[in-house]
């Protein structure tokens, strides 16, 4: 029986693997990955693997943020209102205290 690979994962890709346990761990890994990529020392193959991993991490982070937003909506009774410029300015006045 033939083995099937996990979509988006490649056995020869060291950057592929299970997603982190939570948003904070994913964000930390993504920041480290970006720093490595910005360093300019990765080979083309490693850069592509890093890009794929980064894309997976970004998707995971977006999913986690959407889940958190949904939970806030439930807790807040779906009464969230868009933040207006006037509200943001009024809230920012206390920053100098």
Curated annotation (Swiss-Prot):
Subcellular location: Cytoplasm
GO molecular function list: exodeoxyribonuclease VII activity
Alphabetically ordered keywords of this record: Cytoplasm, Exonuclease, Hydrolase, Nuclease
Signal peptide interval: none
One Gene Ontology cellular component: exodeoxyribonuclease VII complex
Pfam families listed in its UniProt record: Exonuc_VII_S
Alphabetized InterPro entries for the sequence: Exonuc_VII_S, Exonuc_VII_ssu_sf
E.C. number(s) listed in UniProt: 3.1.11.6
KW Glycoprotein (keyword) present: no
UniProt GO BP: DNA catabolic process
Reactions that this protein is recorded to catalyse: Exonucleolytic cleavage in either 5'- to 3'- or 3'- to 5'-direction to yield nucleoside 5'-phosphates
Protein role: Bidirectionally degrades single-stranded DNA into large acid-insoluble oligonucleotides, which are then degraded further into small acid-soluble oligonucleotides.
Subunit structure: Heterooligomer composed of large and small subunits.
Family: Belongs to the XseB family.
Entries under PANTHER family matching the protein: EXODEOXYRIBONUCLEASE 7 SMALL SUBUNIT
HAMAP family (UniProt xref): Exonuc_7_S
Protein name: Exodeoxyribonuclease 7 small subunit
Native source species: Burkholderia mallei (strain ATCC 23344)
Upper classification of the organism: Bacteria, Pseudomonadati, Pseudomonadota, Betaproteobacteria, Burkholderiales
């Amino acid at each position: 029986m033939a083995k099937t690979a996990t979509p988006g994962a490649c056995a020869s890709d060291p950057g592929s693997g299970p997603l982190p346990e939570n948003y904070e761990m994913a964000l930390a890994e993504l920041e480290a990955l970006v720093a490595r990529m910005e360093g300019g020392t990765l080979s083309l193959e490693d850069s592509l693997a890093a890009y794929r991993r980064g894309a997976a991490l970004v998707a995971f982070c977006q999913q986690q943020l959407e889940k958190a937003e949904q939970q806030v909506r439930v807790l807040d009774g779906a009464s969230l209102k868009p933040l207006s410029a006037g509200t943001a300015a009024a809230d920012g006045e206390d920053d100098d205290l």
